[in-house]
């Protein structure tokens, strides 16, 4: 949903979580926009997460979702700027939205990035810069402006 980047994780038992990049998402707008889809799929409303959370098989810490053996990092700010690690963390999907002003290269000292997802909230010029970074670094890149919603079966 535009200007509300989030990752929706569904468990086989019908439980689900909506991990939000923004600490103050417009929850009522989210529910209005997405409840028809949830109802169609006979899903209960997800648990909306804006901060750290963990339960059996699912964790959301420092805007990194760990679920079903995958890691998805929601990036919308400078939280990782000027940070380094001797053992970069593998990130399956780096979901970048409005607010991130850096480059992909800056993140490679922290993360081993497999795929970058560019949110629709990014201005075109930022998307172009990040897409070029991905191309130069041989990292797969998906633009939600071009593709729309992304579903990843696990």
Segments predicted by a language model, with ranges:
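Extracytosolic and intramembrane catalytic regions of membrane-associated proteins
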Residues: 2-154
């Amino acid at each position: 949903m535009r200007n509300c980047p989030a990752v929706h994780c569904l468990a086989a038992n019908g439980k689900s979580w909506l991990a939000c990049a923004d600490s103050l998402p417009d929850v009522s707008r989210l529910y209005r926009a997405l409840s028809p889809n949830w109802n169609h799929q006979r899903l209960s409303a997800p648990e909306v997460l804006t901060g750290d959370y963990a339960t059996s098989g699912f964790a959301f810490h420092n805007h990194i979702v760990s679920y079903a053996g995958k890691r998805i990092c929601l990036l919308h700010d400078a939280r990782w700027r000027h940070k380094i690690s001797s053992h970069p963390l593998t990130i399956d999907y780096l979901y970048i939205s409005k607010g991130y002003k850096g480059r992909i290269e800056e993140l490679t000292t922290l993360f081993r990035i497999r795929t970058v997802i560019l949110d629709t909230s990014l201005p075109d010029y930022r998307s172009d810069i990040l897409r070029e970074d991905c191309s130069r670094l041989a990292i797969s890149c998906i633009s939600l402006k071009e593709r729309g919603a992304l579903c990843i079966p696990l």
